[in-house]
Regions:
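Bacterial C-terminal helix-turn-helix
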Residues: 2-7, 14-79
């Protein structure tokens, strides 16, 4: 099953709509950081698995430099 950009967008949108609904009248805060941190970890997990743990290859797949990748892996407890 190939996941399209649109289906990823739909998942994020629906998840946020549910999150806002669950909050009720409470005003959400730091939504951007919450979403980025939540989405980043599985991206790095999947890409590192695809690259068989090779950080240089994973960085190339992601289009980021290896130092940035290492920083993000550490941030998410993946190193």
């Amino acid at each position: 099953h190939v996941m399209s950009k649109e289906s990823i967008e739909d998942v994020v949108r629906k998840s946020l709509e549910k999150y806002f609904k669950d909050l009720g009248e409470q005003l959400p805060s730091n939504v951007y950081d919450m979403v980025v941190l939540t989405v980043e970890k599985p991206i790095f997990e999947a890409v590192m698995a695809r690259a068989d743990g090779n950080q240089s290859q994973a960085a190339e797949i992601l289009g980021i430099n290896r130092n940035t990748l290492r920083k993000k892996l550490q941030q998410h407890g993946l190193l």
